[in-house]
């Protein structure tokens, strides 16, 4: 499992601006970043690839919001299985 920084996340989506990712987060269409330092955030690579695959598959915004909720829930279970 890797942690991707914002430039890598933008590249995965083809976005040019930071705001496009943060707007997607506010809309519930992307997971929130995880703290990797006092001021640094990153995104688990499997979350980014899962969300990109959902977009490619033509999933609706409602489906993607449900997927985002499931990915956030999965984060809490990761520690229990480690």
Regions found by a protein language model. Give the residues of each.
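Polyanion-binding surface elements
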Residues: 1-26, 50, 54-57
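Short Lys/Arg-enriched helix C-cap and helix-to-coil transition segments
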Residues: 34-41
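Short, solvent-exposed alpha-helical "recognition" segments
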Residues: 27-34
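Short intrinsically disordered terminal tails
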Residues: 1, 78-82
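Exposed aromatic-hydrophobic patches
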Residues: 44
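A short, Lys/Arg-enriched interface patch at domain edges and termini
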Residues: 49-79
